């Protein structure tokens, strides 16, 4: 069997994916819908440029969020902080005014950086002593990802188009908030997993770190390649999509 904590993570991730994909399903439609119908009347090119920039940044910030969790605040607090920021961001988009849309997207980018990498880190630490069960655990976990994505696209998309854009964005924000509350009030079920940053855990244990368990397994060449790829990707993001908006 699997620990009960896995199912807390399952539903937390499911509602986060509901919120994420629900908002994504609405964003381009909202931006390109005529002003008389409540949208912004953007061209497809401009709407997709903003969407692409947002999506790109969402996959960059987890590098920083994972580092902060490892070094300073621990996985569990990172998840809670990220979920709160994302809930505020999505709910602010329900105001459908330029300031709130841009602020909401920015908050979602920042919050996702804390949330995304640390959910899977908690699972990895939960199964540290039972690695043979880890594949099954991640299979169950990603079932929650798929379920949340499907429900979010269907429900938020329908509500946004048929009832109102603000209701669609608001629904995504409400479920993000529910996911955060569920995780926060059930987190004691994880015991000490993710409670402290990895650096503090290693220091407290006073155990020698084996070569395969080092916090930084990368060689100097690996780091150089990572930096080059990251800089090249960031330059492309800043010079291509933004130039079209």
What is the meaning of each model-derived region?
Residues 25, 63-64, 146-163:
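A gly/Pro-rich, aromatic-decorated transmembrane alpha-helix motif that marks the paired
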Residues 71-83, 130-131:
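Cytoplasmic membrane-interface "Motif A"-like loop-to-helix N-cap segments
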Residues 48-70, 116, 150:
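Central cavity-lining transmembrane alpha-helices of secondary-active solute carriers
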Residues 89, 100-115:
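Hydrophobic core of transmembrane alpha-helices in multi-pass small-molecule transporters
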Residues 114-128:
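Intracellular juxtamembrane helix-capping segments at the cytosolic ends
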Residues 1-4, 129, 157-245:
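Intracellular loop-helix junctions on the cytosolic face of multi-pass helical membrane proteins
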